[in-house]
């Protein structure tokens, strides 16, 4: 049930007002079915590390939230294998390999800072076709 807690935190703390840290994501990306796309998540405090426990949450147009990745690279139960999390350089990354039209959604990154989560503004992924 950790995913429920994370999603509730997203709703409650999305402004990030309790932290000096700022989490930045691409505002929008476009891809096509079958392509590989990588979304990134940068921290204003320096390199993202495994200690930030990067989490990725998907929001579908009907406002259904799904936790995809926890702890940088751990796929949540039931999440398709085409979704993977990693660190690339100084950023956290979500890679979708073989994108499907159903992957069109908003994707939010959350980073852990000692005692609270800070969320990025989200990336709107458009899948053409």
From Swiss-Prot:
Q: Does the keyword Signal apply?
A: yes
Signal in keyword set: yes
Instruction: Locate the Pyrrolidone carboxylic acid modifications and list their residues.
Output: 20
Tell me which residues make up the Ig-like domain: 20-125
- What's in the keyword line of the UniProt record? Adaptive immunity, Immunity, Immunoglobulin, Pyrrolidone carboxylic acid, Signal
Q: Which GO terms describe its cellular component?
A: immunoglobulin complex
- Cite the Pfam families for this sequence: V-set
Q: Tell me which positions the record assigns to the signal sequence.
A: 1-19
Q: Which GO terms describe its biological process?
A: adaptive immune response; immune response
Question: Which domain of life does the protein's organism represent?
Answer: Eukaryota
Record's SUPFAM superfamilies? Immunoglobulin
The record's annotation in PANTHER family points to:
IMMUNOGLOBULIN LIGHT CHAIN
Name of the protein this chain belongs to: Ig lambda-1 chain V region S43
Which species expresses this protein natively? Mus musculus
């Amino acid at each position: 049930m950790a995913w429920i807690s994370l999603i509730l935190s997203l709703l409650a703390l999305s402004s990030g007002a309790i932290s000096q840290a700022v989490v930045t994501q691409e505002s929008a990306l476009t891809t096509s079915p079958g392509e590989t796309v990588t979304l990134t998540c940068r921290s204003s405090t320096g390199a993202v590390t495994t200690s930030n426990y990067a989490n990725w949450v998907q929001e579908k147009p009907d406002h259904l939230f799904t936790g995809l990745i926890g702890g940088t690279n751990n796929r949540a139960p039931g999440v398709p294998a085409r979704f993977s999390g990693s660190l690339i350089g100084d950023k956290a990354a979500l890679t979708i390999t073989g994108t499907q039209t159903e992957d069109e959604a908003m994707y939010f990154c959350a980073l852990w800072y000692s005692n609270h989560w800070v969320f990025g503004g989200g990336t709107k992924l458009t899948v053409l076709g």
